[in-house]
From Swiss-Prot:
PROSITE patterns: NOL1_NOP2_SUN (PS01153), SAM_MT_RSMB_NOP (PS51686). The keyword RNA-binding applies. This is Ribosomal RNA small subunit methyltransferase B. The lineage of its organism: Bacteria, Pseudomonadati, Pseudomonadota, Gammaproteobacteria, Enterobacterales. Its main location: cytoplasm. GO terms for biological process: regulation of DNA-templated transcription; rRNA base methylation. The keyword Cell membrane does not apply. It comes from Klebsiella pneumoniae subsp. pneumoniae (strain ATCC 700721 / MGH 78578). Specifically methylates the cytosine at position 967 (m5C967) of 16S rRNA.
Length: 431
């Protein structure tokens, strides 16, 4: 039995770790969720994700409602007030309950003397809400993105940037991948309906199912038995270009948490797959996914820039490089990305991607296929990256994804309900 813990104080502490300490929410949130009951885990997640999704609005509101920002040891109270404002603005929690629980959060973070301040700020917002929101609707922060990212999106996508921003600010749908070795997609959809859940198919990806309403994995028919995996439709699109076949030696580079590794083995169960990632901790999730789906791959920790260290001189029939990137295509899934990324990161990531591409190309057999993929929507990491690689690599040929002038296939966030994703299929010419 979990003891009664103030959820609002936990949310405030998590958000503070992200905004002030640069921690990823995916690292900060799970340990906090272990402290609360199962029924409260979803609310804690909603509060954290919601505040980070709307952070620039909440910051602006606090600047209007308070004469001075909270600093030093009182900084957590600043984020607790944000949690309160988010509940009043965006949730169905009755306002009196939202206020009471948020004010009580001050006790949990050992700032009981500030209960009156928190209560006063939130009640002041209730009184002034209509006027404040009307003013905010004209403010530059209304797009809920940092200025540097907004500028990049406007430059890269002058016609679509507003749609991208709108998609980034939505709650993401829950996509699943049906394991074709257990059931066809339509067979599994029938099982889903029997379980009282509704799903929709994707026009391009044959194994994809989108739930009408997100559900816990234990509610999904056969999840524990490996019948289905949680994976966005756009990530499933990698197989459309990789096209793995039985008997081939295939490298999945930057493989954690293993969604694409297991997809390769569902499409080509007799393929010999090596899954490599630099992050040893995240590799544990690759092992977990392989075990749940009952498939085997050779899993190694290694740096993509130095393949000789983990595969010697071996060459592969196909390589999937899901390159480290800005993750600007999955902001709706990870709203902390907006506040963790910096403008300078983009050039550094593009340099890293180029180094990995250069290093791994020598490990592709002549006639082999390399699929370069990112969950970014920035040209520096995508079309420009591949154009530069083609220009310096005489035996590389673009195939079925874009044109040499504008190489690759770019999916924008929200299109067909999928994440933002980029793919380029490269063939190594035979001499």
């Amino acid at each position: 039995m979990k003891k009664n813990i103030n959820l609002r104080s936990l949310a405030a502490q998590a958000i503070e770790q992200v905004v002030e300490k640069g921690q990823s929410l995916s690292n900060v949130l799970p340990p906090l969720q272990q402290k609360v009951s199962d029924k409260d885990k979803a609310l804690l997640q909603e509060l954290c994700f919601g505040v980070l999704r709307t952070l620039s609005q909440l910051e602006w509101l606090i600047s209007k409602l308070m004469a001075r920002p909270m600093t030093g040891k009182q900084r957590t109270v600043h984020f607790l007030i944000m949690v309160g404002l988010y509940q009043l603005l965006y949730t169905r929690i009755p306002p009196h309950a939202a206020l009471a629980e948020t004010v009580e959060g001050a006790v949990a973070i050992k700032r009981p003397q500030l209960k009156g301040l928190i209560n006063g700020v939130l009640r002041q917002f209730q009184r002034q809400q209509e006027a404040l929101l009307a003013e905010f609707a004209e403010h530059e922060n209304r797009y809920l993105h940092p200025k540097w990212l907004l500028k990049r999106l406007q430059q890269a996508w002058p016609e679509q940037w507003q749609e991208i921003v709108e998609a980034n600010n939505q709650r993401p749908p829950m996509w699943l991948r049906v394991n074709r070795n257990h059931h066809s997609r339509d067979e599994w959809l029938a099982l889903l309906n029997e379980a009282g859940l509704e799903g929709f198919t994707h026009p391009d990806y044959p194994d994809a199912v989108r739930l009408a309403t997100p559900a816990p994995v234990h509610a999904l028919p056969g999840f524990a038995e490996g019948w289905v995996t949680v994976q966005d439709a756009s990530a499933q699109g990698c197989m459309r270009y990789l096209q793995p076949e039985n008997g081939e030696r295939i490298l999945d580079l930057c493989a954690a948490p293993g969604g694409k590794t297991t997809h390769i083995l569902e499409v080509a169960p007799q393929a010999q797959v090596m899954a490599v990632d630099i992050d040893e901790q995240r590799l544990s999730r690759v092992y977990d996914n392989l075990k749940r789906l009952g498939v085997k791959a050779e899993v190694k920790q290694g740096d993509g820039r130095f393949p000789e260290q983990w595969c010697g001189n071996e060459q592969f029939d196909r390589i999937l490089l899901d390159a480290p990137c800005s993750a600007t295509g999955v902001i709706r899934r990870h709203p902390d990305i907006k506040w963790l990324r910096r403008d300078r990161d983009i050039a550094e990531l593009a340099q890293l991607q180029a180094e990995i591409l250069n290093a791994i190309w020598g490990h592709l057999k002549p006639g082999g296929t390399l699929v370069y993929a990112t969950c970014s929507i920035l040209p520096e990491e995508n079309s420009q990256q591949i154009a530069a690689f083609l220009a310096r690599t005489p035996d590389a040929e673009l195939h079925a994804t874009g044109t040499p002038a504008s190489p690759g296939q770019q999916n924008l966030p929200g299109v067909e309900e999928g994440d933002g994703f980029f793919y380029a299929k490269l063939i190594k010419r035979r001499n």
